[in-house]
Amino acid sequence: MLKNDDTIVAIATPSGYGAIAVIRISGNNSIKIIKKIFCSFSKNQIETNYIHLGYIKYKKQIIDKVLIFLFKKPKSYTGEDIVEISCHGSIYIQNKLLSIIIDQGARLANPGEFTLRAFLNGKIDLCQAESILDIVNSETFFSHKFAINQMRGNISLLIRKLSKEIINLLSLIEFELDFSEENCNFINYLEFKKMLYNIIKKLKTLIRSFKIGNALKNGISVSIIGCPNVGKSTLFNKLLKYERSIVSNIAGTTRNYIEDSLIINGIKFRFIDTAGINNNTKDYIEKLGIKKTYSKINKSDLILYVFDDLNEKFILKKVKSLQEKYPKKKIFIIINKYDLIKKKIKEFNYKKIFKISAKYGYGVNNLLSEITFFSKKITSLKENTIVITQTRHYESFKKAIFYLYKVKKNLYSISPEFLSIDIRTALDYLGKVTGEVTNEDILSNIFSKFCIGK
């Protein structure tokens, strides 16, 4: 069992110097500890739900002038007694206060342990716990919006409704089992299949939402690819509006991919400058770079295929070859160095082709507008749509659907006892999302990603 009966302490604010810092204590002895070291200016009893001004004193020495906040269980973040100390942001003061509180019987918290205790004490479910980390890490309007919705319990509520529907299916099967000796069928199998189909349909909608949710949370991946020395790095820098990648007229300068982000209209884009594709190279390092390029292409939402000439047959051959290898990928053809090309484009048999000069910026804004427009098509959502952003949830929902499909397939061919096992397994996978069914390994993996003070 996970132990949570002692008192923990941690610095809750980012490390380093600052105007203020916050130190958080949680556990049965947190208020007892603060009463030993805090001298209130008001000389009154330290009460909960009030802010108190005073000194932290230790061995007759004043350490700092602080504000303290007391939260009595169960009305606190962790469901335990909590004290938060707001002190000056000196590194010495922070470490000294931490040391004093540990001397008084607390121990240093593990990463995410405050939120873990909130989960163990029933203040939040596992889905909401993950959303807190997402809120802390949110960089854009949409990543913040999804995290807030998850924290409010929107996904948890939907899972509870789906679980209830699955329990109804299970009840029908169990009822059939209870009266199996009567040689009577109590299940209306047509109605049962209809209920099963509706549950699967809702789960599939959640699974489909993951592509959108993941893109909006982690960023839309845009890989810039092409032969060596066609201007990929120059375009990469121009899109980011600063010199992020080394630019040289020597072919093969970029041996590894370089990635950086840009936020446009609340959406995060992850632009990736890749190694030039030279299938004839004998250079081992260059081959490794090209291998990574193809790996990035496979994971990209959009590919910018850069060329620096107008050989239509060559270009379409290259694009067709890539499209055959990655049939679901969206590809934009980029004709770079257009200012140097004497033969101008009249017609070109491809939907998305952009004439640019990455060096001088010609056509880059138009390209950026099209990239933004593309993002809207893959991220368009109806108002109040529930979207999943966690890979863990996605995998659990896929497993739940797998077992429900087994029930659908075997409905008329196997004993209700075996159908019951598959339905229970599907129910368990939904329970894993909210933490109703879990183990210590899952909890450790989730909460280890938090900072120590959270």
From Swiss-Prot:
Pfam families: MMR_HSR1 (PF01926), MnmE_helical (PF12631), TrmE_N (PF10396). SUPFAM superfamilies: Folate-binding domain, P-loop containing nucleoside triphosphate hydrolases, TrmE connector domain. PROSITE patterns: G_TRME. GO terms for cellular component: cytosol. Binds 1 potassium ion per subunit. (6S)-5-formyl-5,6,7,8-tetrahydrofolate binds at residues 24, 84, 123, 454. GO terms for molecular function: GTP binding; GTPase activity; metal ion binding. Residues 219-376 form the TrmE-type G domain. Keywords: Cytoplasm, GTP-binding, Hydrolase, Magnesium, Metal-binding, Nucleotide-binding, Potassium, tRNA processing. InterPro entries: G_TrmE (IPR031168), GTP-bd (IPR006073), GTP-bd_TrmE_N (IPR018948), GTPase_MnmE (IPR004520), MnmE_dom2 (IPR027368), MnmE_helical (IPR025867), P-loop_NTPase (IPR027417), Small_GTP-bd (IPR005225). Its EC number is 3.6.-.-. Homodimer. Heterotetramer of two MnmE and two MnmG subunits. This is tRNA modification GTPase MnmE. It comes from Karelsulcia muelleri (strain GWSS) (Sulcia muelleri). The gene is mnmE.
